[in-house]
Amino acid sequence: MSQFKRVEDGIFIAPQPTEQDIQEAKQQGIRTVIDFRLSSETATSNETLTKNHGLAYVNIPVNKAALSASQISDLDAAMKGKEGPFLLHCETGARVALLLSLSKAKQHDWTTEQVFAEAKRMGFDLKSSPEFSAFVMRTID
């Protein structure tokens, strides 16, 4: 899984996967793919491709300009309601890092700095995005 980054047991993050990546994910034991892309970002959904490979598929559309706490709850519900291991992706992985870090913050009562540090550990600087940074500040108060 060259482009898949293991961020903790049973959770991998990635940019937009190809069909070959989905095949590899299945071979590596991934059971559920959670896609954070908007329908406007791609000509086709990963849903059919993912299901054709026998994996569960969940779409949580995340618009950088319209971030909401409900998206964190949707991620939590998807991970509780489906079987892992999980592959979480968007176009680059940044929205994944944002929501996954905020989900963990909710579980562990983290500060904003801990959220930023967790996303950085995943390879993303949320502070470099005004929208992401503001959302973290609004969510962790």
What spans do the regions from the language model cover?
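A phosphate-binding catalytic loop at a beta-strand-loop-alpha-helix junction
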Residues: F86-A97
